[in-house]
């Protein structure tokens, strides 16, 4: 569990003289091919785990490593793979997708939502439930329906100098007004309501597409949100807007967008047909996954710089903790293990070692994986045409705040 000291078990004999160790090497969950790859990962450690799991169930199929140009292609492929298995008669709940953090799964969430695949997120907050996304969507809610009191309340409270009392008073003056232009004119006379906040709504209402409206609102609110979330993973939050922007391209109006993804969200289990509430894909953070298992497991974005994560590379102990994290993810699979990754890297570029004290560690855990342990499928194109153009995370300046990716 998080925060535990593995040395308590690893050095148990030293700490408890006269004790004996009984090794439980028979594994009842996974097939031998999955365990062979997991055993190989632990075997690369400088720590002497001396742990070789044997599958009670015998042999199965080789794990696969699927490599993509970027996270959007990675997410799209996973969704198509899920749909193929569904068409073959499988249930959604036979699939589990493991990710490091909620932020790292946003492109995947967008693809699941767009494809109307029901899912539950364990260990993280869903895309449309995050505060920064709700903040921007409050503007779209007002533009679509000027009588949306909750939308007005959330939007006005984003701006400095406006508290609950001021916002409530202002809203009471426009609550029965079905014209956004008239509401804006009334609020312009309120001393504490900024003209900038109203101009964003005005410009957004003039947009010809949902995507254009969304971009106007994000652009206008950018500094306000940056200040609000400057110490709360702002750089990661920006990337969520790229996912929403892509989803906004699938609808013809703001109201249709809100109805599709906010008012009647297909990603909630409550939206499933009666009797199928549990038939959902599980998206789960690895730190929440101990004890979990599933027929088919996808381990998301096992890319260079991610396993081990870059910031762990100044400590051998941290690198070994990263190894155990990946080991936990891989051993959740019962029948099929699919590891996905993305980026423009080669085997040579990711195979270098890092020296820490008197030991050398891998910069990337899968850099020298043995061919007999897995099947490699490289989906990358010769050129990177599918990268997001004009994405919010690229088009806006990076914050100066140091970001903790966890």
Predicted regions, residues:
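Conserved RecA-like helicase ATPase core segment
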Residues: 1-68
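Conserved nucleotide-binding/hydrolysis micro-motifs of P-loop NTPases
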Residues: 4-7, 27-32, 60, 72, ...
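Short glycine-/polar-rich loops that comprise or flank the Walker A/P-loop
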Residues: 16-21, 60-63, 93, 115-117, ...
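Conserved RecA-like ASCE P-loop NTPase motor core of nucleic-acid helicases/translocases
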Residues: 24-26, 63-70, 78-129, 136
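Conserved phosphate/pyrophosphate-binding and hydrolysis machinery centered on Walker-type P-loop NTPases
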Residues: 27-31, 55, 68-75, 98-102, ...
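A polyampholytic, Gly/Pro-enriched intrinsically disordered region
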Residues: 43-45, 73, 137-159, 386-404
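Conserved helicase C-terminal RecA-like lobe
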Residues: 137-368, 372
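Helicase C-terminal subdomain and adjacent C-terminal extension
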Residues: 344-406
């Amino acid at each position: 569990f998080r925060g535990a000291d593995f040395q308590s078990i690893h050095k148990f004999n030293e700490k408890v003289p006269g004790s004996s160790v009984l090794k439980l090497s028979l594994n009842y969950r996974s097939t031998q091919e999955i365990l062979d790859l997991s055993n190989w990962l632990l075997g690369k450690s400088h720590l002497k785990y001396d742990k070789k799991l044997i599958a009670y169930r015998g042999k199965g199929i080789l794990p696969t490593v699927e490599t993509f140009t970027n996270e959007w292609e990675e997410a799209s492929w996973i969704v198509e793979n899920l749909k193929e298995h569904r068409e073959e008669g499988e249930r959604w709940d036979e699939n589990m997708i493991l990710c490091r953090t909620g932020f790292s799964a946003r492109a995947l969430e967008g693809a699941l939502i767009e494809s109307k695949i029901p899912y539950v997120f364990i260990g993280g907050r869903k895309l449309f439930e995050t505060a920064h996304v709700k903040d921007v969507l409050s503007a779209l809610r007002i533009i679509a329906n000027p009588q949306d009191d909750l939308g007005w309340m959330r939007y006005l409270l984003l701006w400095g100098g406006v508290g609950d009392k001021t916002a409530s008073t202002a809203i009471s003056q426009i609550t029965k007004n079905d014209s956004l232009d008239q509401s804006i004119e009334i609020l312009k006379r309120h001393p504490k309501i900024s003209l900038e906040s109203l101009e964003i709504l005005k410009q957004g209402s003039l947009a010809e597409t949902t995507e254009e409206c969304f971009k106007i609102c994000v652009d206008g609110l950018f500094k306000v949100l940056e200040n609000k979330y400057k110490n709360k993973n702002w750089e990661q939050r920006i990337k969520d807007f790229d996912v929403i922007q892509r989803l906004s391209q699938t609808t013809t109006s703001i109201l249709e967008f809100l109805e599709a993804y906010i008012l009647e969200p297909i990603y909630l289990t409550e939206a499933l047909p009666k009797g199928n509430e549990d038939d959902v894909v599980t998206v789960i953070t690895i730190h929440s996954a101990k004890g979990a298992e599933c027929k088919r497991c996808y381990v998301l974005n096992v890319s260079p710089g991610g396993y081990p994560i870059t910031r762990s590379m100044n400590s051998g102990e941290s690198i070994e903790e990263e190894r155990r994290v990946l080991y936990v993810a891989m051993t959740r699979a019962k029948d099929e293990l699919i590891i996905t990754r993305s980026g423009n890297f080669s085997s040579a570029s990711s195979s270098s070692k890092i020296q820490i004290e008197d030991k050398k560690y891998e910069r990337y855990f899968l850099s020298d994986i043995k061919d007999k342990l897995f099947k490699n499928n490289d989906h990358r194109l010769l050129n990177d045409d599918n990268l997001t153009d004009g994405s919010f995370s690229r088009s806006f300046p990076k914050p100066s705040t140091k970001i903790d990716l966890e």
